């Protein structure tokens, strides 16, 4: 790249396990081990990471911001967004929208503005029944909460989280029980099995939601 810095870049393709989004599970996978989280402490990556060597773990979104910051400076980057949530972030928009995709936007934009301007609105001009603000594990918002700002604080103050930045819009015709079952089934399948509440709990949740979705729900459910 025209500099005096010399380094090797190796691209290692993972198998796509959800748990390997956790940094220590990712390191286990790179070492050829079972993809499951390590105990922290003592296995903080910066202390005992890949092959027990100090390791810096960053995701692609973080790295993608580095060139702009190097060129323009951190102070300029912090002028983007709002206080407490500065800069930009990459959000993945999917569901019942006209223009699904990955978008880099300034923090502080409302979910409604995001969907209307970049997402092209909801398909067939339907209303939003509910939406997921930050990935499958984030608590959902109602369709009348589109004015919530895409900031850490505003989302947290409304009892959810930005999480992975995966925004999923569900229109007025969506069966929310079936949608919840689909997500729970995903977690049941992707559980690494290390911890009992996740390993057993997600399977039970899947069975309960399956009963409700098929009309066999119980009062206790």
Where are these regions (language model features)?
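Structural signal for hydrophobic packing residues in well-ordered secondary-structure cores
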Residues: 30-34, 67-77, 118-123, 184-191, ...
């Amino acid at each position: 790249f025209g500099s005096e810095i010399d380094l090797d870049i190796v691209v290692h393709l993972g198998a796509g396990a959800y748990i390997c989004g956790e940094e220590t599970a990712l390191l286990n996978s790179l070492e050829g081990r079972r993809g499951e989280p390590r105990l922290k402490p003592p296995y903080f990556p910066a202390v005992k990471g890949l092959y027990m060597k100090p390791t810096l773990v960053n995701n692609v979104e973080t790295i993608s911001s580095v060139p702009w910051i190097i060129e323009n400076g951190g102070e300029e980057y912090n002028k983007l967004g709002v206080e407490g949530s500065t800069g930009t972030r990459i959000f993945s928009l999917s569901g019942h929208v006209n223009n699904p995709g990955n978008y880099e936007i300034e923090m502080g934009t409302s979910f409604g503005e995001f969907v209307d301007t970049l997402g092209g609105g909801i398909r067939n001009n339907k209303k939003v029944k509910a939406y997921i603000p930050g990935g499958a594990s984030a608590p959902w918002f109602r369709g009348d909460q589109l004015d919530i700002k895409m900031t850490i604080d505003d989302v947290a103050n409304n009892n959810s989280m930005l999480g992975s930045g995966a925004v999923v819009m569900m229109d007025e015709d969506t069966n929310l029980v079936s949608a919840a079952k689909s997500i729970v089934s995903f977690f049941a399948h992707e559980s690494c099995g290390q911890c009992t509440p996740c390993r057993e709990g997600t399977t039970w949740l899947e069975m309960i939601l399956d009963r409700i979705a098929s009309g066999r729900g119980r009062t206790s459910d």
